[in-house]
């Protein structure tokens, strides 16, 4: 396998991983600490990722307990969650922040599915952009007589197969997220 294909697969794999992370951040009916991954907390004047400041527990299906390592920032964590667009109402008992997720309405589910489809399309576009960049490299090599025309055609076909494989992975992630969102 050529270096161009290996490099393209690596980049496409990271595009799929990014899509997976984006899907994890979309709220479903169940509690999932990953929904707090992108949340930044103002900690001593510096925006800090929440997962660096606290541990997470899921004691019940729709409850997340967030226990800050530094108890002095409990109010900051609560404020960051309240100000976010996660749609949860945090309560704080001085030591931990408890987030009870409300049941998703049909309208909210459809909104999240639409968001998931948008994230999937962004992932597909990223994969196709990698293919385009790799194809450009292959064509340049053929133009510079580093590879033959037959080799160029073979590499382009191989890139198309690799692209299809990674786009299908994103489609599977989307399908799984949609079924998770439609679960009641």
UniProtKB/Swiss-Prot annotation:
It is found in: Cytoplasm. It comes from Cutibacterium acnes (strain DSM 16379 / KPA171202). Belongs to the RRF family. NCBIfam families: frr (TIGR00496). It holds the Pfam family RRF. InterPro entries: Ribosome_recyc_fac, Ribosome_recyc_fac_dom, RRF_sf. One of its GO terms (cellular component) is cytoplasm. Its main location: cytoplasm. It comes from the Bacteria. The lineage of its organism: Bacteria, Bacillati, Actinomycetota, Actinomycetes, Propionibacteriales. Responsible for the release of ribosomes from messenger RNA at the termination of protein biosynthesis. May increase the efficiency of translation by recycling ribosomes from one round of translation to another. One of its GO terms (molecular function) is ribosomal large subunit binding. Gene3D superfamilies: 3.30.1360.40, Ribosome-recycling factor. Keywords: Cytoplasm, Protein biosynthesis. This is Ribosome-recycling factor. One of its GO terms (biological process) is translational termination.
């Amino acid at each position: 396998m050529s270096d161009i294909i290996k490099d393209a697969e690596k980049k496409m794999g990271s595009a799929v991983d990014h899509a997976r992370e984006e899907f994890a951040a979309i709220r479903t009916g169940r509690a999932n600490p990953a929904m707090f991954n992108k949340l930044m907390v103002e900690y001593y004047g510096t925006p800090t990722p929440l997962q660096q400041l606290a541990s997470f527990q899921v004691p019940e299906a729709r409850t997340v307990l967030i226990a800050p390592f530094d108890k002095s920032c409990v109010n900051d964590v609560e404020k960051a969650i309240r100000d976010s667009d996660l749609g949860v109402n945090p309560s704080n008992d001085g030591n931990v922040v408890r987030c009870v997720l409300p049941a998703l309405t049909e309208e909210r589910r459809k909104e999240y599915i639409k968001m998931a489809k948008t994230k999937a399309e962004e992932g597909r576009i990223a994969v196709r952009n990698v293919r385009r960049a790799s194809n450009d490299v292959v064509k340049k090599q053929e133009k510079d007589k580093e590879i033959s025309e037959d080799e160029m055609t073979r590499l382009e076909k191989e890139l198309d197969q690799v692209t299809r494989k990674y786009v299908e992975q994103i489609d599977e992630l989307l399908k799984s997220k949609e079924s998770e969102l439609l679960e009641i």
